[in-house]
């Protein structure tokens, strides 16, 4: 059955959607990127911080160029609320166990979810339920946080006690994990 009103409404909605996507695309065409030639990462980040009024109270950064080896850190040991960042070292922990032959991708993490599926859901879709199942297999939160220490270069003296009990990490910890 043909419904001309529904067809027209659907076309209008599609046209509005396409138009709303075209406006930012057209604006992007007129954007002129800043000239960064001859500037170091530090100079670029310092200019960005100045432009956006960022300082050690509201900005933390760790940068590493995998091609050149260039790195830059700013306020990199300041602990901040971790959100889903805990999933990076958590998944690496299980990948290490797989490489050591201690566990396989077919190992069931929950009823119905293998380790391979848990990795995928945790890293691609940020699935909290499966990620929680992964860290609970290690132990409680302080035990999980202790197990993750093997990926970090920070010394015991550099890591405050609240690291073990709060959901906090710093950019240096995450960068260390990425470099493993």
Question: Language-model segments: what does each one mean?
Answer:
Residues 79-103, 109, 122:
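Active-site SXXK
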Residues 1-10:
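Bacterial N-terminal signal peptides that target proteins for export
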Residues 56-63, 103-110, 131-135, 156-162:
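Surface-exposed patches in mature extracellular/periplasmic domains of secreted proteins
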Residues 15, 21-79:
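Beta-lactamase-like hydrolase cores
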Residues 103-125, 145-157:
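Active-site helix/loop module of the DD-peptidase/beta-lactamase fold
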């Amino acid at each position: 059955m043909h419904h001309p009103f529904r067809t027209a409404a659907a076309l209008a909605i599609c046209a509005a959607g396409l138009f709303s996507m075209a406006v930012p695309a057209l604006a992007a065409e007129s954007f002129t990127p800043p000239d960064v030639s001859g500037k170091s990462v530090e100079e670029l980040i310092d200019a960005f911080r100045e432009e956006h009024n960022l300082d050690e109270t509201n900005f933390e950064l760790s940068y590493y160029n995998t091609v050149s080896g260039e790195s830059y850190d700013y306020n990199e040991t300041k602990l901040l609320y971790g959100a889903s960042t805990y999933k990076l070292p958590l998944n690496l922990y299980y990948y290490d166990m797989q490489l050591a032959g201690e566990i396989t991708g077919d190992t069931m993490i929950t009823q119905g979810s293998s380790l391979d599926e848990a990795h995928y859901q945790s890293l691609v879709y940020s699935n909290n339920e499966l990620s929680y199942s992964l860290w609970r297999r290690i132990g409680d939160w302080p035990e999980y946080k202790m197990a993750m220490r093997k990926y970090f270069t920070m010394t015991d003296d550099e890591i405050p006690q609240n690291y073990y009990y709060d959901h906090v990490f710093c950019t240096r910890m995450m960068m260390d994990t990425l470099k493993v």
